[in-house]
Amino acid sequence: MRLLNIFTTLCLLLWSGAATNDGLTDVVEWDPYSLTINGDRVFIYSAEFHYQRMPVPELWLDIFQKFRANGFNTISVYFFWSYHEASKGSFDFETSGKNVQRVLDYAKEAGIYVIARAGPYCNAETSAGGLALWGSDGSMGTLRTNNAAYYQSWQPWIKEIGAILAKNQVTNGGPVILNQVENELQETVHSATNTLVLYMEQLETAFRAAGITVPFSHNEKGQRSQSWSTDYENVGGAVNVYGLDSYPGGLSCTNSNSGFSVVRNYYQWFSNYSYTQPSYFPEFEGGYFTPWGGSFYDECQSELDPSFPDVYYKNNIGQRTTLMSLYMAWGGTNWGHSAAPVVYTSYDYAAPLRETRQIRDKLSQTKLIGLFTRVSTDLLKTDMIGNGTGHSVSSTGIWSWVLRNPDTQAGFTVVQQASSGSRASVTFDVYLNTSLGAVTASDVNLNGRQSKILVTDYNFGNHTLLYASSDILTYGTFDVDVLVFYLEQGQIGQFALKTTSKLTYQVYGNSVFAANSSSTSTSQTFTYTQGAGQTVVQFSDGALVYLLDQPSAWKFWAPPTTSNPQVKPNEQIFVLGPYLVRNASISSGVAQIFGDNDNATTIEVYAGSSLTSIVWNGVSLSATKTKYGSYSASLPGTESRVISLPSLTNWESANSLPEKETSYDDSKWTVCNKTTTLSPIAPLTLPVLFSSDYGFYTGQKIYRGYFDGLTYTSINITCSGGLAFGWSAWLNGVLIGGNTGVATATTTNAVLDLTNFTSVIKSENNLVTVVVDYHGHDETSTAKGVENPRGILGAFLVPKPSASTGFKLWKIQGNAGGSANIDPVRGPMNEGGFYGERVGWHLPSSPSLPSDSTPLIGLNTSGISFYTTNFTLALDSDLDVPLGIKLSAPAGTIARVMFWINGYQYGKYVPHIGPQTVFPIPPGIINNQGSNKLALSLWAMTDAGARLTDVELVSYGVYESGFGFDRDWSYLQPGWDEGRLAYA
């Protein structure tokens, strides 16, 4: 460690001059300490966000405002190629949820930077990792290399998306500050002629040709290789700012004591491989995904615990990290068929901001770190002074990181338990070096999985903290300097102000607060025990100090008065109490505050002496001035607001699998007649039955195969649809088997016994109908990735004829229009091949269905039924009421369910696999005021049939909001037209 410190220190000394840039712009620069934007150092606190997972553009701003309010100044965004190029050469960057410019405009409006991640490969648990699905037929060549076919495939994408990103760079007044090239591409061979090196150089050339001038970045896939850093074996393809992805939690949804072991060698890693660049985490664990058959996110308390950000994110700060992006900050929904097979409909990810857009305690704790780093400019240039167990502390049970700014001598000591997963409460002393000599911060307590950042020589406005043992939340410079600390209730805090005067003070609140006898002629020390709620200390020199317990800190807000992502201490207002403060301004003494609230509370605003009144969401509050200069008022909650959700009744229904009957006319279907394929996976039988070879890339597929003869004893069928998929087969309308699916199988085979169906078999024109479910295309972490075929991989009759499969003809049907993207608003991954989908029964204003059966009655045999109902909502326009659909089925039910709200497929429910049973639906997909259409498909996979026991609208919460969720969403909900009948 000592040799490494010496080496790193020498590097930093050699780098003490001007920051480095990419030679194309000096607006964004970097050095070993931090990123610099427009000449100012900035701590990049970034939130990963995927607009594809929220198809309502207006709600992007809702989410961005919540990010900004909770301390983030940046979003990291994947741009999924698959979402924008449904068929080769046909790009869509403008229609509804695919409007990239609106993403960037809303980011700028919200006051946050953008790190652009346009791939072309992204991973992200999205189908095919974001590669265009038209390449699933094998036509892209060798993926993620400099292969000529692959180059020709991705180049138009980079040209198109690159041009949009280029005009939105910070150099042009936009929000884009970094451009990531590719994604977690491991440089396993450091050779200038290696295909990956050549591929990276191709990509960088293409991005530059598209107009990108901001620095390039990349994300190392964990500490597994050393890739694309100019500081380590740079043979070509290196980026400007190296980054390391890390998901270190090791947490278990079923064992809360599992994992929680922090990584303490990040500092060494960055010192070895990117020592001329700032330490950057393009993806750090904001949560983690759960698979089919796993635990649902709401059940995973270990991942949701606010102690995770408190310990892990401060651990990163202790290792000199100044760029950190949380994956995910908001996960969203894998609506339609957009998910990769490793995940199901919900992509909540146990992220700080829930899929429902609700603030979790985890986000509230994450905010405390964001607001601290926003104003702590001395943190942006620090050297490692030392670290280790028992370092600068009185206990070997404590690990510390000690950092110091070489220019200002401000210090930051991060403490955590040496065994980071410990739940013990430990008290110890910390030995600090200050400008006035060594001091001891006594009685520092860590209550289990907790971390603290102690500061020395910390400037806030015209004041300086000699040291503090409490965590700083933030500070502001108003008429006076206002400092905010937080601790858990009952913990002891200590701080010393540098002053030559003997300060007097007034205490407002119930924390026990006192001056220490150890005060000197140059500093004055104070000790307190944190009480419940907030305490305010007003000093005689004008300084104001808020002492908050953790719940109060979670409801503390510092809305900026500037749209600049870089917020100065004098560009904010302090607000305490509400559930959320979106933004605020002050003019002529009036604080105009917009936000959301749930429970009745007291709102307190500190904005300096000019403040005279408070307006909340346009309503003037009866406010009273406090003795220390803030204003407070009662803020009503929503406890008394009545939310009435209708029961889902008056169902209509129809058969959605007429294709299993021999009388069905398939004359317009696509004939499977190919005997060769570009796929790297060889078909098991011919003709090729891979669905992508016939232009059906997404959703369920239906096959009809014909054979003659009475002598066959079985049919051997192999299908692939992604993890947890299933398939069913009918012979002349009678179920003969299939595979109901298991969570761990992507491909399954079954030998379907025909000996019990002799009465069904005919001498000629026997029909086998096969329905194959689809759970997305694989990411490249799975063998051939997107090129792993979907649908039927092989089928033959037994006994197998010597020169054939026994089948004389196969036909295929998939989503209406195939790759034509006939519903551009909802996009290319919304629909599959069920009859009800093809003819548009899920769309608003579609024709009535002939039966009045309900999904609660269901089917008494195998098959697929389609159900629709309409309902009306009348939620008050000033409310945000996150809604969802709850589904349940009797124990032992073997079935597959999908449902659509106003045409959007927003849930896949597989009761025999799980785990999801409740599905959030955002405003814009559902109309909070007005009519809605719910459609549901029920696929009974056995002759026992299937039914549901519950289809219910549910509410996740009620919030009075200043955002405005009562809008005309009709442009997002195009209705049915007769053209759909062509796909019957």
Swiss-Prot record:
Transmembrane segments: none annotated. One of its GO terms (biological process) is polysaccharide catabolic process. It is found in: Secreted. GO terms for molecular function: beta-galactosidase activity. Keywords: Carbohydrate metabolism, Disulfide bond, Glycoprotein, Glycosidase, Hydrolase, Polysaccharide degradation, Secreted, Signal. Its main location: secreted. Gene3D superfamilies: Beta-galactosidase, domain 2, Beta-galactosidase, domain 3, Galactose-binding domain-like, Glycosidases. GO terms for cellular component: extracellular region; vacuole. It catalyses: Hydrolysis of terminal non-reducing beta-D-galactose residues in beta-D-galactosides. Cleaves beta-linked terminal galactosyl residues from gangliosides, glycoproteins, and glycosaminoglycans. This is Probable beta-galactosidase C. It comes from Sclerotinia sclerotiorum (strain ATCC 18683 / 1980 / Ss-1) (White mold).
